[in-house]
């Protein structure tokens, strides 16, 4: 019970039943005792004169084992009320209750040892003159005219007139309307019996006041006269006389080795019409045992039996046995009389190719019951099945079931697989502008059959056709057919209209002396596709190439490819190797000199450079020149020169001159223009172009670029004009 500050009786009545155990399995009430099943509290006596109540054990204890008894007790509200509560462990019969009054319901218990909580010490049954202070509790004292309330271990049958003290008695607080916790422990190994009594509330003590009696007390009894090879039962009693009090107890724990006999018997299932003997029927395995008496199977009697094996149903048999000490046990088993179960399943029709699970398909309507009407559908299994949903025909499924009683049943049903018609047709490849009638073209190979093998080709129709033979591509034709059973089928074929593949490749310029691989050079941008758009670049080959990057000029590369359909195509690109292509990206002057003869100097400035990191810059009017090897030019051929220039500020002229003889007289310029007249390109540079013709090649000619103001020259190119 939870500790609470409870001062009134009516407050304790609200304690939850879960705080205390239900005593009815091990106790029976006697006299004025009543048990409240809502609170699990037993009232031994009301506050009425001349009452006597007890709860006596319905079983026995094996004293070879320890036990613990814990309970909350209520001794009443009247400080001079009578008589108290006692508990005894004895060798008497089951249900024994001793002398009432001062005997507290335990006096006379055979070979018993008790513990009394006596609140009225002047009863005729109270002991006098003992050596444990029991008699000293009698008399009339200030505040205690009926003797001192006290507690301690007593013998229940040493003296037939009173309970005899076995150990030192101790005073306890008079009844005060409070609950107290009593704990009694038996230590079988050390043969020691102890008791502990504790008040549960303390709010009646004023600060600074010392209580007259202890609030917690302990008692010990060493080597009590228990016969350990014998059974002991127990009784808890209370009484009132000329004075009274309300006496109650709520048992928290009784942890002991109880020794009542035990019946063992199993539930059984019996086939309808079988002979049934409740003591010998196989599977019941009827048996009764007792710790002391041993095997009691022969003493079992059938207390009740309503089994009728002529009719299915659930019946009950109750067995009873009693040991030599009067303890008893009952056991009721369940007897189920059963017949074979039943299975219900219907014939079904399914489509060819359909997924079919006979156990779960709702069309089968599978259900099963045992003979008691319990649903056992989940226990049904497929015993056999030859169903092949890929082939039309009639098949058989056999179900089986075994119920929980061992009864068996089988059920077979028919499964008809209804097939669909089939269409056969081939994929087709066509040339552009070929004609195609999908229903009659022999290349399609169109045929249809119903599920019985009958030819229904004449019933085929074209459901969809997007073929356009004027354009290459992948197309589709869908056929459909309905047979005489109403079953339908469709067939899709692929029609490929094939054209030539295509190659994409760019004309490119390659620097003199540069390594050039036409198949992999990213400037070429080589790609190839078949007429259906599939990439076939990896299949492209070089059919021919006359490229010689050691000599400036114009060259050709011819690519070719054949697709998986055998279609072939070629592609020719032009490759130009410039005479000059100097943009100074890497800082190399590439043979350019000042007109006086020394190498030009380049400025490293990525922001000002046209390409890369370097650019030619001069703040003055300056001319630069480069000698062209005779081998890089062809006589009677036109060439184009391009200069990329940028004025530092404002605008000025830029002149380009071609001198066929470096030592010869001045020649007309290729062009002499304001820089601003050029085409605007990257980084504010202007592109200026002009052409010249090579008419003789006796000496290595000279190209002169003259910048008439401060500015930048980002690059110079010379290429042959076709």
UniProtKB/Swiss-Prot annotation:
<keyword id="KW-0843">Virulence</keyword>
<comment type="function">
    <text>Promotes colloidosmotic lysis by binding to the midgut epithelial cells of hymenopteran species.</text>
</comment>
<dbReference type="InterPro" id="IPR056573">
    <property type="entry name" value="Lectin_L-type_dom"/>
</dbReference>
<dbReference type="GO" id="GO:0030435">
    <property type="term" value="P:sporulation resulting in formation of a cellular spore"/>
</dbReference>
<keyword id="KW-0800">Toxin</keyword>
<keyword id="KW-0749">Sporulation</keyword>
<dbReference type="InterPro" id="IPR008979">
    <property type="entry name" value="Galactose-bd-like_sf"/>
</dbReference>
<dbReference type="InterPro" id="IPR013783">
    <property type="entry name" value="Ig-like_fold"/>
</dbReference>
<dbReference type="InterPro" id="IPR013320">
    <property type="entry name" value="ConA-like_dom_sf"/>
</dbReference>
<dbReference type="InterPro" id="IPR032179">
    <property type="entry name" value="Cry22Aa_Ig-like"/>
</dbReference>
<dbReference type="Pfam" id="PF18483">
    <property type="entry name" value="Lectin_L-type_dom"/>
</dbReference>
<protein>
    <recommendedName>
        <fullName>Pesticidal crystal protein Cry22Aa</fullName>
    </recommendedName>
</protein>
<dbReference type="GO" id="GO:0090729">
    <property type="term" value="F:toxin activity"/>
</dbReference>
<dbReference type="Pfam" id="PF16403">
    <property type="entry name" value="Bact_surface_Ig-like"/>
</dbReference>
């Amino acid at each position: 019970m939870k500790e609470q500050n409870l001062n009134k009786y009516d407050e304790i009545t609200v304690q939850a039943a879960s705080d205390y155990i239900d005593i009815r399995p091990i106790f029976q009430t006697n006299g004025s005792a009543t048990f409240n099943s809502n609170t699990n509290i037993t009232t031994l006596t009301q506050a009425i004169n001349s009452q006597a109540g007890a709860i006596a054990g319905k079983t026995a204890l094996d004293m070879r084992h320890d036990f613990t008894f814990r309970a909350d007790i209520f001794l009443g509200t009247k400080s001079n009320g009578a008589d108290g509560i006692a508990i005894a462990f004895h060798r008497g019969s089951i249900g024994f209750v001793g002398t009432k009054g001062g005997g507290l319901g335990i006096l006379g218990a055979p070979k018993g040892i008790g513990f009394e909580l006596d609140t009225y010490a002047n009863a005729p049954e109270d002991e006098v003159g003992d050596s444990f202070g029991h008699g000293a509790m009698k008399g009339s004292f200030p505040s205690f005219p009926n003797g001192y309330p006290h507690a301690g271990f007593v013998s229940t049958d040493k003296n037939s007139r009173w309970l005899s003290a076995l150990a030192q008695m101790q005073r306890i607080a008079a009844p005060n309307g409070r609950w107290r916790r009593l704990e009694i422990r038996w230590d079988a190994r050390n043969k020691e019996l102890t008791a502990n009594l504790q008040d549960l509330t303390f709010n009646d003590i004023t600060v600074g006041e010392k209580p007259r009696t202890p609030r917690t007390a302990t008692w010990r009894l060493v080597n009590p006269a228990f016969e350990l090879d014998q059974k002991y039962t127990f009784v808890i009693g209370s009484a009132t006389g000329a004075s009274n009090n309300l006496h109650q107890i709520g048992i928290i724990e009784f942890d002991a080795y109880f020794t009542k006999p035990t019946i063992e018997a199993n539930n059984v299932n019996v086939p309808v019409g079988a002979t049934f003997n409740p003591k010998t029927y196989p599977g019941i395995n009827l048996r009764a045992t007792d710790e002391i008496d041993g095997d009691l199977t022969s003493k079992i009697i059938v207390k009740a039996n309503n089994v009728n094996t002529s009719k299915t149903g659930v019946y009950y048999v109750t067995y009873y046995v009693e040991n030599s000490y009067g303890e008893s046990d009952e056991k009721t088993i369940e007897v189920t009389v059963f017949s074979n179960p039943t299975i219900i399943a219907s014939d079904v029709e399914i489509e060819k190719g359909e997924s079919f699970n006979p156990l779960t398909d709702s069309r089968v309507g599978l259900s099963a019951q045992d003979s008691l009407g319990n649903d056992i559908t989940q226990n049904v299994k497929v015993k056999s099945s030859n169903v092949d949903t890929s082939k039309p025909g009639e098949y058989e499924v056999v179900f089986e079931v075994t119920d929980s009683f061992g009864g068996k049943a089988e059920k077979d049903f028919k499964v008809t697989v209804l097939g669909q018609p089939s269409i056969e047709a081939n994929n087709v490849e066509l040339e552009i502008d070929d004609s195609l009638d999908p229903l009659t073209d022999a290349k399609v190979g169109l045929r249809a059959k119903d599920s019985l093998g009958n030819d229904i080709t004449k019933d085929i129709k074209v459901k969809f056709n997007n073929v356009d033979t004027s354009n290459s591509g992948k197309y589709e034709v869908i056929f459909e057919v309905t047979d005489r059973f109403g079953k339908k089928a469709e067939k899709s074929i692929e029609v490929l209209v094939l054209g030539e593949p295509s190659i994409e490749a760019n004309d490119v310029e390659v620097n003199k002396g540069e390594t050039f691989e036409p198949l992999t050079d990213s400037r070429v941008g080589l790609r190839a596709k078949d007429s259906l758009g599939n990439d076939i670049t990896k299949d492209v080959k070089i059919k021919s190439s006359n490229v010689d990057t050691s000599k400036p000029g114009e060259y050709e590369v011819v690519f070719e490819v054949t697709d998986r359909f055998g279609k072939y195509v070629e592609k020719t690109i032009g490759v130009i190797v410039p005479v000059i292509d100097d943009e100074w990206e890497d800082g190399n002057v590439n043979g350019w000199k000042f007109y006086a003869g020394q190498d030009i100097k380049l400025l490293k400035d990525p922001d000002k450079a046209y390409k890369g990191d370097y650019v030619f810059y001069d703040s003055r009017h300056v001319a630069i020149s480069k000698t062209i090897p005779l081998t890089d030019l062809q006589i009677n051929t036109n060439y184009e020169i391009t200069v990329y220039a940028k004025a530092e500020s404002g605008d000025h002229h830029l002149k380009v001159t071609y001198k066929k003889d470096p030592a010869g007289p001045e020649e007309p310029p290729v062009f002499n223009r304001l820089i601003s007249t050029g085409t605007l390109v990257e980084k504010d540079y202007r592109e200026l172009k002009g052409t010249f013709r090579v008419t003789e090649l006796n000496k290595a000619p000279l190209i002169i670029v003259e910048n008439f103001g401060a500015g930048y020259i980002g690059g110079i190119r010379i290429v042959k004009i076709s």
